[in-house]
Design a protein with these regions (language model features):
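Membrane-helix entry/capping segments
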Residues: 1-5, 9-10, 14, 50, ...
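Intracellular coupling helices
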Residues: 5-21, 25, 297-338, 392-403
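Short, strongly hydrophobic transmembrane alpha-helices
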Residues: 11-43, 54, 413-437, 448
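Generic structural signal for small/hydrophobic residues in well-ordered secondary structure
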Residues: 12-15, 22, 43, 59, ...
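Small-residue-rich transmembrane alpha-helices
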Residues: 31, 35-36, 254, 335-395, ...
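Membrane-proximal extracellular/periplasmic loop immediately following the first transmembrane helix
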Residues: 33-100, 110, 138, 208, ...
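Short juxtamembrane loops and helix-capping segments at transmembrane helix boundaries
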Residues: 39-53, 197-206, 246-248, 267-272, ...
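Mid-to-C-terminal secondary-structure elements
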Residues: 119-132, 145-276, 472-653
Length: 657
């Protein structure tokens, strides 16, 4: 068989360009397919890493118009204790965010800014925390906390983290203590679970115990029998006195299985819940499969093109005594090796560029063997025609002269080439449409100006003690035009904060953003009726509301109308702007189109985000350095992370891109 291989190598040398292009095509196709398959498998098995996933449910509230996952603490506690079918429950505050910690003392003091989640101790009984050291029961002690392994190694190195102290230099929301002792270290969670790798510590036993207005908590329950979930909700809905609580008049409960949360598109509007688009994932997987199909067809055409050049030597070997089965086996083996070589190179590329794959390179067996199966199928299909056709022609016909493809073989090649070009053109057109959609999302007008505006989050110390000092020093700097404040980054997240008010005897709902009086003018948001807030409005005792145009159409509001907000403040409509989008366009067809947007002005509101507008032509590097140094001077615990408003969309749609 050496002559067959020698002839094959000679043929490859003669067709270097074609052989190289085929290998490159298969490598790229397999690499793309496996990278998409890794993501698809990760999403398909989302949250299934937890052994009790089928019995874990999240408590949701539903009305005739909407559904949401956040709960009032006493309401969640009432539900968790309402049925013997609920074996365990946990209540989580996902809003704490990052907290500035210091470790050590005096000269060897080190600082870190790490995410914190407060919760009730039942979380370790519901979810699978894989203990590395310490004890999971440490959450029963309000002084202790759980750390992910990566964080423990980053902070404490290879030494044991158990018993080490973390001192918070700022308040931890929903917790009374600032000093935490590491009681346990758990193995990091993968990306495909709702639980984040954060510092877990117990929720304060007195926080929000009697607060029936604070919808900030998530509640998960563990059931003994998942089939009883509807009965549990039905019994609770009948027994609980909803009518006694103004905020619960139209509410009913619903349990959502943990594994179903990821693809619940109606939950995309909250950033602390991981979500995905199944349709988008399926389309991406289908596209990657088509790319592999194109590469395989190209491979088949290549092997068919080699038939006339190899058929004579193949049949000479048959005359010399090689059996047809043996010849066909080796021809198929060549195709298999060709495909497997391409697949092996694609795996090496995945290892080299693992950082480019969402969630890192975690190839499960099903993905590896799926790709291997496709490579074997490619070899089988590509080797079928040469193996069968080239060995079935009578030797006397072949040895009498040159030989080409039969009319059927030529028609087959023409059909394959035609199909290949058709699929390629379809993919190119689809890619152009997808690119256009992404560009539309990224360039979508949010209704406000974002040029030369940098946003930085301030810690509580600066917000409460040094805000005036911070503001005056910024306004006195030559490269800064003005500074305003808001409760969040406008247009930077999928989340909208919902509010409600009593107006003319009816309840109206809207999304809102707390802002300083000069925020709208700084962001170039103008009023087309009434006016926007001004600096002197900061002294006003009532809340001043500036709505977008949807409020006029849907709520029949007018300038000067007064209302009572659900959080207890008197409010007055100051004016109306054009339509403004304060969150992403992910949900533009649903939630953003449903409710109007209000900018709420009152200086007493908590607004940790500073919007700093730079002068045209200002040296951004020098300005940011000045701000950083000033923040470090005012509060060493503030670790500023600057972001320009015009970059929000790039980060927001990173997954689509």
């Amino acid at each position: 068989m050496n002559s067959i291989y020698r002839n094959f190598i000679i043929t490859l040398k003669v067709n270097k360009m074609a052989a190289t292009l085929n290998i490159c095509g298969l490598v790229i196709a397999f690499t793309l397919f496996d990278s998409v398959a890794i993501r698809t498998e990760s999403e398909r098995t989302f949250d299934k890493i937890h052994s009790k996933a089928e019995a874990i449910y999240r408590l949701d509230c539903v009305t005739s118009k909407s559904q949401w996952p956040t709960q009032i603490l006493p309401f969640a506690q009432a539900f968790a204790s309402s049925s013997p079918h609920i074996l365990e429950s946990t209540i989580i505050n996902p809003y704490v965010g990052e907290v500035y910690f210091t470790i050590g003392r005096d000269e060897i003091l080190k600082d870190y800014k790490e995410p914190v989640i407060t919760c009730t101790p039942g979380i370790v009984s519901i979810f699978d925390f894989q203990l590395v050291e310490g004890s999971l029961d440490c959450l029963d002690d309000p002084e202790k906390c759980l750390l992910p392994e990566s964080m423990a190694r980053k902070i404490f190195g290879e030494s044991s983290a158990i018993g080490k102290e973390l001192l918070a230099e700022e308040e931890i929301w929903s917790k009374e203590r600032k000093s935490l002792v590491v009681g346990g270290v758990y193995k990091d969670f993968p990306e495909n679970t709702q639980l984040n790798n954060a510092i877990y510590t117990s929720l304060s036993s007195t926080y929000c115990m009697d607060d029936w207005d604070n919808w900030i908590f998530l509640c998960y329950v563990l059931l003994d029998d998942p089939s009883q979930k509807d009965l549990i909700c039905s019994q609770f809905n009948q027994a609980f006195p909803f009518k006694q609580y103004e905020r619960l008049q139209e509410v009913q409960t619903r349990l959502v299985n943990l594994c179903d949360i990821y693809y619940m598109n109606d939950m995309n509007s909250v950033t602390y819940i991981k979500s995905g688009n199944k349709r988008q994932t399926d389309l991406l997987f289908s596209a990657s499969f088509l790319v592999v199909l194109i590469a395989v067809i190209n491979f088949i055409n290549f092997t068919m093109a080699l038939v006339p050049a190899r058929i004579k030597s193949i049949n000479i070997r048959k005359i010399l005594g090689d059996s047809v089965r043996r010849l066909r086996g080796f021809l198929w083996l060549e195709s298999f090796l060709f495909a497997l070589l391409s697949y092996a190179i694609s795996l090496l590329l995945l290892l080299v560029y693992e950082g480019c794959i969402g969630g890192g390179f975690h190839m499960k067996g099903i993905v590896f063997f799926g790709g291997l199966f496709m490579a074997l199928c490619a070899g089988l299909l590509a080797g079928a025609y040469p193996a069968i056709y080239a060995t079935s022609i009578p030797q006397r016909i072949v040895l009498n002269g040159s030989f080409g493809l039969s009319p059927k073989g030529k028609r087959m090649r023409e059909c394959l080439v035609g199909f290949q070009y058709t699929v390629s053109i379809i993919l190119i057109v689809l890619s152009l449409f997808i690119y256009k959609q992404i560009e539309t999302m990224r360039s979508h007008s949010f209704g406000f100006g974002n040029d030369n505006v940098v946003v930085v989050e301030l810690n509580k110390e600066i917000t409460e003690k040094y805000k005036e000092n911070f503001t005056n020093r910024l306004r006195g700097y030559a490269g800064i035009e003005d500074v305003a404040f808001a409760a969040s980054k406008i247009g930077a997240t999928n989340e909208n904060r919902g509010g409600a008010a009593e107006f003319n005897g009816e309840t109206i709902y809207f999304y809102y953003l707390n802002v300083s009086p000069n925020f709208l003018s700084l962001m170039d948001i103008t009023a087309n009726e009434g006016r926007v807030s001004r600096m002197e409005d900061g002294r006003n005792k009532e809340l001043l509301l500036v709505f977008d145009q949807k409020a006029k159409r849907q709520l029949n509001l007018h300038v000067g109308d007064r209302m009572k907000t659900f959080w207890g403040n008197d409010a007055r409509v100051l004016g109306f702007t054009d339509e403004v989008v304060i969150a992403s366009t992910h949900k533009a067809s649903e939630s953003l189109a449903t409710y109007p947007v209000a900018f709420v002005t009152n200086e007493e509101l908590y607004m940790p985000y500073a919007y700093i507008k730079l002068m045209p032509g200002a040296d951004k590097g020098n300005v940011l350095l000045y701000i950083r140094n000033m923040l470090n001077e005012l509060s060493p615990s503030c670790l500023p992370d600057f972001e320009f408003c015009d970059t929000f969309s790039r980060h927001l749609y990173e997954k689509e891109i």
